[in-house]
Each structure stands twice: as structure tokens, then as C-alpha cells.
Amino acid sequence: MDDPAISSPTNKHFFVIVLHGHKSSPMIPAEFFSTYVEGKNHQSTKLKLTSDAFDRTWEVKLNGRRFAGGWENFSTVHSLQDDDVVIFREIGDMTFHVTASGRSFCKLQYISSDEDRADEDDAWNVYSDSKNIVSKKKPRTEAESSSKNYYLVAHVTPSNLSRDRLYLIKAFARSNGLNERCCEIDLMNKHGKSWTLGLRYSTVNDQASISGGWRDFCLVNGLEAGSFYRFKLVQNGERPLLRLCYDTIPEEDCYKGNRKVNLSESASMKQGKFLTMTFKPYMLKSGQLRLSRPFAIENEIKEAEDITLVDKNGGNWPSYVASGDGQGGKYYLAKGWRSFCAANRLKTGETFTLEFVRGEGTTPMLKFCSKSKDKIEQVPFDEGGETQEETETRVKKRARVSAERGSSRRNQASNKPNADPQNLQPGQPHCSISDQVQKVKQIIVDTLTGIKRIRSELERKGQKLEASILEIDALGEKVSEINKILK
């Protein structure tokens, strides 16, 4: 029997991503909430949730748009992981059928908890061929286990980048004969350039992985940590080949039989049009919004193209696309970004989402959708909001500039395109000249302090060397006395 929640294309639906690093309480998207939920006594609204995994219904309370009482129990029972995509389809009045899609956008199987998983943040990174989500108590059939599945969705994480290793889920490796093999494997980018890595198999945890070049491949091709990228197994012989692709996965390769469901396509397309990131200090200081090349390519964003930033109140901020230098360079928006941030009152650590909209005959738009105060793990910053490396670079550069050019530094700063006064709101806070002078003074003082500390260390080392010379002289005198005695 077909899943009633996903067989009808007219059903209203939305999807959320379980946030990383905490017990997440997802929020219903604002547009969906205002259209279909708001006004139904939402202060005491309860949602009824069903799934394929269990023959029962859960009640989940809403606190505004956020899931509250009952959600933690539902997510625990269904073994939801960090960064899982969860699709909600309405099948009745305030009743939703829930499909957990793992870290890909197709449905996954619930695998028994005692099955080894070598790496938690790489566990659900493959398109599943299963027809339905099955219960933990229902074993997979031989047909399900042996079915071919050529698509892999890799979740790039800080951990697999630092280890230079990507683990392959067992179902994908087994169905394509990649388990229990040790050989070379090629990763190809969309331009046809290949990187040779090693395919390895661990008997300890029955896990296949690729290593020895994964970090370099991600760096050169602009694959960012926290993002998902699709690969297709296009060659499987003595030397397998995985090709990076940005196009939508064909429906027939993701599902079997006569099912006419385009869940993976629709979810993937929606995900490709949304840009979710955490607001960090450098975004405001640089005056730039950086766009990854995969996001730009998927949405056909081109260099020098005009784009309008639309804030939460509908205000427009004209901008344009520029490109960084070098292979794997990124696109970025500069003009209007600071004013856009001020209009939406973005603060450090907040997660926000932008939707890319391209209409026929109109300028493309990046619309502000929502933001959350739930902070995710960030790189440590100093009191000025910069990393230690950025601070050291800034100290050296500003000290040199202030010594060489003096007051002309302020005139240059006022001529930067990122500080265009037309893009700043009248009430936007700014640094006064006295504040800038004080900052430069403090930088110089800090630099001098560092120089004095280095000089002090050199003096101490010099004293140690002088003491060593005296010891050597004394030793030489003793040697001379011994020689005289021997003669």
C-alpha cells in the first residue's frame, strides 16, 4: 500500500532540519505557520504526528511556532540524529505524516542499535533504496539488502575533514560491492578532473571508507563543512569512480517499482534554494555575504549579476555578485549587506535562513526567512570578535599602516565600497574618529609590549650563552692542568 502522506502531490507539507549540537526543538516555517496553522487557537495548538515506523499517533504541543511537549519523545523513539531532514505532510486537520530522511533527502531504514557505526556524523550519508521506513523490529529482506543504489550524499563535517576520511554507510558499500575491498578509488569533479584516493575496509567495525585526499578534494572544489553533496558511482571495477554532481537525482534511481513519488527531487530542490548559516563577526566587518560555488551553480547565479536582498519587513537592498580569485573561489555579495544585517537585527551566534527566488523577467532575490537564537559550535573568538590568527594579522597590518601613513588611513577607509554611506541606515551605530585613534594606539602598545617581551627573552638567552662560555673556559683550564701533569 502506498504511503498516503506522500502519494498525493496536493498535500501541504514542510520540512525541518534537526539542528546540530543540542536537543533540538524545531520550528514550523513562518510562511507555512501563518497560512495553515495560525488562528487555530495556536496558544494551545496540538499537532498529531504519524509515521511508517509505528502504528500509533503522537501528540505534540506547539509553543508559538516551536515544537514543545511530546516532541522529544517522538524524536527519541524514531532515533533522529543531528542534521536529519524531517518532512511533515498534512493528511488531516492538524495531523501530519512524518518522514525521517536522514542526512540525505530520501527515506532511510531504521537500523538496529547494536549495529556498528564507525562515525556518527557520517552515518546517514546515502540515498536509500528502501520502499518504506521500517521499524527497528522489522529485519531487512535479502532483496532490500542487495538492491543497487548508485547515489551517495556525502555530509562534509569538520571531523571527516580533519581526519581526511569519509566513511561509507554499510548499505551503500554492500549494494555496490565496495565493502571488504582495499584499492584505489577516484573522485571526479563536475569539470572532469579526478583525484585518486584509497578505499579501505576495517574488519573491526565492518566499515568501508575513503581517505588520502578527501580534505584536498573538498578544499579545491569548495565543499564546505556542514553541507551535503551528491556523488554518483559511474564506474565500479578494479578502480571505482565517484563523480560529483549538482543536478537533481533521477526519480527512478532513488525509488524502485512503480512508485511515482518525487520526494527526493522536491526536497532537494527546496534545500538548494535555501541558504542557512550562523552569523559571525567577520560577516559584518568584511561587509560581504559569501556564497559557496555549489549553491551559486545550482541556482545559476553568475558573476556581476544583480541580486536584491529583501529583509524581514519587505525592504529592498540592491546588491551584485562578485567572485573571488583562484580555483574553487567563492562568490560573494558586498553592496547593501551591512544595512541588510542591521534591518534584520542579526546578532553573533544566531542562525538565519535566506531563500533564493528567481522570477521570470525580474531581478533575483535573497529573501530573509527566519532566524534562531540557538547557537552552534563556533571557532573561539577574542573580545573583538576575531579568531586569534585574524587578530595577529590585523595587529601587524594596522601597526605598519599607521606608522607609514598616519591619518591618511581614515580617508582610505571612508573610500571603501563596502562602507558606502548610501547603504547605511541613519540610526546605524558607527565608530567615531577618536575610537579609531584609540584602537590604533592600543594596537601599537600591544605590538611594543610583544617586542619588549621578545627582547627580554633574547637577553635571558644571551646570559645563558655567556654562562656557557665561562663554563667552557673553566673546562679548558682544567684540561690544560691535566696535560701539564701528564707531561
UniProtKB/Swiss-Prot annotation:
Its main location: nucleus. SMART domains: B3 (SM01019). GO terms for biological process: megagametogenesis; pollen development. It is found in: Nucleus. Residues 11-104, 151-247, 274-371 bind DNA. Disulfide bonds: none annotated. Keywords: DNA-binding, Nucleus, Repeat, Transcription, Transcription regulation. The keyword Lipid biosynthesis does not apply. InterPro entries: B3_DNA-bd, DNA-bd_pseudobarrel_sf, REM_fam. It holds the Pfam family B3. GO terms for molecular function: DNA binding. Signal peptide: none annotated. It comes from the Eukaryota. Residues 379-431 are annotated as: Disordered. One of its GO terms (cellular component) is nucleus. Residues 409-431 have a biased composition (Polar residues). This is B3 domain-containing protein REM2. The gene is REM2.
